[in-house]
Swiss-Prot record:
GO BP annotations listed: sodium ion transport
Pfam families the UniProt entry points to: NQRA_2nd, NQRA_N, NQRA_SLBB
Functional description taken from the UniProt entry: NQR complex catalyzes the reduction of ubiquinone-1 to ubiquinol by two successive reactions, coupled with the transport of Na(+) ions from the cytoplasm to the periplasm. NqrA to NqrE are probably involved in the second step, the conversion of ubisemiquinone to ubiquinol.
EC primary class: translocase
Assembly with partners or alone: Composed of six subunits; NqrA, NqrB, NqrC, NqrD, NqrE and NqrF.
Lineage, top ranks: Bacteria, Pseudomonadati, Pseudomonadota, Gammaproteobacteria, Pasteurellales
The keyword Transport belongs to this UniProt entry's keyword annotation: yes
Protein name: Na(+)-translocating NADH-quinone reductase subunit A
Amino acid sequence: MITIKKGLDLPIAGKPEQVIRDGNAVTEVAMLGEEYVGMRPSMKVREGDTVKKGQVLFEDKKNPGVVFTAPASGTVTAINRGAKRVLQSVVIRVGGNEQVTFEKYDVAALNQLTGEQVRRNLQASGLWTALRTRPFSKVPAIDAVPSSIFVNAMDSNPLAADPAVIINEYAEDFTNGLTVLTRLHDKVNLVKSAGSNITAVGAVKVHEFGGKHPAGLVGTHIHFIDPVSLTKTVWHLNYQDVIAIGKLFTTGELFVERVVSLAGPQVKNPRLVRTVSGANLTQLTENELNAGENRVISGSVLYGAKAEGPHNYLGRYALQVSVLAEDTEKEFFGWISPQANKFSITRTVLGHFGKKLFNFTTAENGGHRAMVPIGSYERVMPLDILPTLLLRDLEVGDTDSAQSLGCLELDEEDLALCTFVDPGKADYGSFLRQALDKIEKEG
């Protein structure tokens, strides 16, 4: 077992009850285009078209053969685009039960599948997009071969669901999905929390991690088990997509159900809810939130997307819906007050004393300023890198130095804690993405 000692378990109120219940019914779902790094869509549908579940909505021009399929049957009501015609979302009003079917196999035959059969079914169904590369966090090319595949069956994010609860609900499908992945590649790593009751198949290598967040991030697992470089790539996916793969290969149908944590200080009854991928989050959270102005987040409070407008939907890779109170009020002389109800990693407020949970809000508690290297980054970065030097290089755009310091191993979520503890309020995730895009383009 690998124990992570540096990091931070955010003491946030609103932790979910680890019991699965049905969420609100939704009548609208969407595919979010900006979730897919570097993707350029070739649209296969128009507004007003009727689509089946599993029907192709668009294909990646840069990565021919990678298709993105509808999570529900119904009518395409909007194709939203942003600046420079970037695809924001394809919105579907749910209606009917028609669906596209794919190849299916007996459970006993899964262990005899060829790699080509697995690729063909994943790509036709759109489940190929469950896989992402490291470095660069892109959907892999249809003929690419990784060094290994990582299945992340743990989650240390604040307010996260316990993966074991969900996996045990779909135990057979999870096992079948793992079997399929072993036919795609002979090196499959399953990572779970220490002592977690999750069963793997024989050909899968099991690893256990424990300790503070980011112990549950796949970037942490890759760093310690099979580090990547510019010439070495691994793939990863989450445990719910493994369940979906198991369902696909045994039923021939696209499985889009998601169990997400609906939690946070502003949620009346924090719990695990059953919904669908791409669900409209206004509908999912209706009558679930405390009064006042709230921010609904698709994903973790540390690294998630604000759900509003064209992005008001559950993300493809999101396993959480987090809700915080919007806080736009400026606190008069807040820096000099005792702040008994505020949290700080630097122990400069009274809120540090005693173990209690905090009602975090969207307030940044300060303005943007220059980097202040006081050791905060080192306290929350468990990877074998020099965080202050790396973050400095990312902020000034020195990609050569950033690459030598290990930025290729990282994704935006891996720097979320550094952003959280930064006195200068910089968004290091966006700096990292700019650097990765430049490195991929220029080498």
